[in-house]
Amino acid sequence: KAVIDQVSNPLGFRWFKFDADKGFFLIGKPLKLMGASRHQDYENLGNATPDALQIKDIELLKAMGGNYLRLAHYPQDPLILETCDRLGILASVEIPVVNTITESDAFTNNCLNMQTEMIKQNFNHPSIIIWAYMNEILLRLKFSNDKPRQQIYFDHVRELAQKLDSLTRKLDPSRYTLLVNHGSWDLYNKVGLTKIPMIVGWNLYSGWYSGIPADFGKFLDRHHKELPNTPFMVTEYGADADPRIRSFSPIRFDKSIEYAIQFHQVYLNAMLSRPFVAGGMAWNLAD
């Protein structure tokens, strides 16, 4: 009889854990999760990226020594996770809830439905260790001139985060939850978003958008001091660079290769020297 349809699921045996003091462990051994975030697009092709280029991205990550991929900010082509399974790249996947929310039942239900579908569709991939559900959700603040109304908005954001986190833990108790914030420490703590997920993600750009690279290590230490029981990762970091631009005296915003290298050296040294930092993802894998 002819085969009409078939479903193939990967099989992988591994166990892992996050520790707020010691970082990440895979099969009982410490492993610093280092890699990149990834958007699914390519020059002149946009989102219609052919399989060969999808696979090439993951092979590039592996070749540069990466062991972790953050799919940002949405589930991507199934081939990506299939390739991560095959190459031994660990991964997180997230739904597209970015920068702001809509305060409505329809929006909330859509978010919950997206999270449910993402988990059920990808549950069997051994490469996945984390389900995520928000990215920089307080970046574009609403109601800045109306503090009482803004507080109501913050309450809605926190309630949605709690619903998504609780749903995720119920659907898959074997994996971790992640909520990703931009570098506004006081704001996210005030709203209560750092207390909800199992792992907190920070997108940090000290020395690029603001500040100096040396501020980065201070931020890492602050998290460990003020949230000592919560594991965390640096889910984004980086400085824009253009391969055509070189400099003997690199400075911020010159987009030179030299400034980007200096930037990465500071960040990598800070993360690698602190066992409590579970990992770091450069932004972005490919542009």
Which residue ranges define each predicted feature?
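Substrate-binding clefts and catalytic carboxylate motifs of secreted carbohydrate-active enzymes
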Residues: 127-132, 141, 148-186, 191-287
